[in-house]
């Protein structure tokens, strides 16, 4: 047993290379000669390092990321083109006022052409108004008896007047009346229709009385069927007081012969109101636009509205 221990201790000393153990091996007495190991048979032990400190992995070297060495290609200069604005649509300017030729003198000739050498188609008086179509040099173009006509544009004879427009229907009715200015008055002239839309034979646009003129322009301009006399027309439409009359209303009057009658029998005349005290009607001579006289106002009975 001692021998085995001695071999073991010596072997361990040889393996570990520990001096105290080797010294101890020398003092051990055995009955057999000491075992000698050839130098070539000694194992080579690895260097285990300091057993008290743990082995640390060496930190990995930090490497910078590969950066591209090539410069990025420059973007080509693209010209900035501003989009062209879309053209605005032409919006017609709609006037809210109607233009008229206001007559400043009595017996002003209405001529067939723009000059004194043209034939006279008729005459208008101070305070009357005509439809203004346009100015042609020193003349105003108008419509008279359904024809193109002219009056002097001299400030001594005429000027321009304005009236506020009404609805589209109202203006169409008035336009029909403007065509007929200057047409002679004939009492009892044949009507356009019988009040129910049945057209009558013998009708012509060359003569009118007050109710047949209103019947014609209301039908042509707005398709409205007025009856055949002032005393039946006054029952149509909606009643309007004097203080509320406006452009396009029909104004009904009495006269000297009917002044003392009652009901519809008082009615003896009808006119189309244009505004600012002006009416379009025909009475005793021809169709005209004129201001209401004091007498005409005194004969006013009622107004009727259709628009």
Regions from the language model: what does each represent?
Residues 123-128, 134-137, 149-153, 183-208, ...:
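Glycine-rich catalytic cores of cysteine/serine-nucleophile enzymes that process amide/ester linkages
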């Amino acid at each position: 047993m001692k021998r085995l221990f001695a071999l073991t201790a010596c072997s361990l000393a040889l393996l570990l290379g520990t001096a105290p153990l080797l010294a101890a091996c020398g003092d051990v007495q055995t009955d057999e000669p000491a075992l000698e190991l050839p130098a070539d048979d000694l194992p080579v032990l690895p260097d285990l390092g300091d057993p008290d400190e743990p082995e640390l992995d060496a930190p990995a070297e930090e490497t910078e990321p590969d950066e591209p060495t090539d410069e990025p290609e420059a973007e080509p200069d693209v010209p900035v083109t501003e989009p062209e604005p879309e053209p605005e649509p032409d919006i017609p300017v709609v006037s809210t006022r109607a233009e008229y030729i206001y007559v400043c003198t009595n017996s002003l000739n209405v001529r067939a052409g723009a000059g004194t050498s043209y034939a006279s188609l008729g005459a208008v008086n101070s305070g009357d108004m005509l439809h203004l179509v346009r100015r042609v040099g020193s003349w105003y173009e108008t419509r008279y008896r359904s024809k193109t006509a002219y009056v002097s544009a001299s400030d001594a004879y005429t000027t321009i007047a304005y009236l506020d427009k009404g609805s589209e229907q109202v203006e169409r009715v008035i336009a029909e009346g403007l065509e007929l200015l200057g047409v002679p008055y004939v009492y009892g002239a044949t009507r356009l229709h019988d009040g129910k839309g049945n057209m009558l034979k013998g009708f012509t646009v060359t003569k009118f009385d007050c109710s047949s003129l209103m019947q014609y322009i209301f039908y042509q301009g707005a398709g409205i069927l007025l009856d055949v006399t002032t005393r039946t027309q006054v029952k149509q439409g909606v009643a309007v007081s004097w203080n509320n009359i406006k452009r396009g209303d029909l104004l009904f009057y009495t006269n000297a012969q009917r002044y003392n009658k009652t009901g519809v029998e008082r009615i003896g005349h009808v006119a189309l109101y244009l505004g600012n005290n002006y009416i379009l009607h025909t009475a005793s001579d021809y169709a005209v636009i004129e201001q209401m006289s004091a007498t005409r106002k005194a004969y006013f009975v009622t107004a009727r509205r259709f628009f």
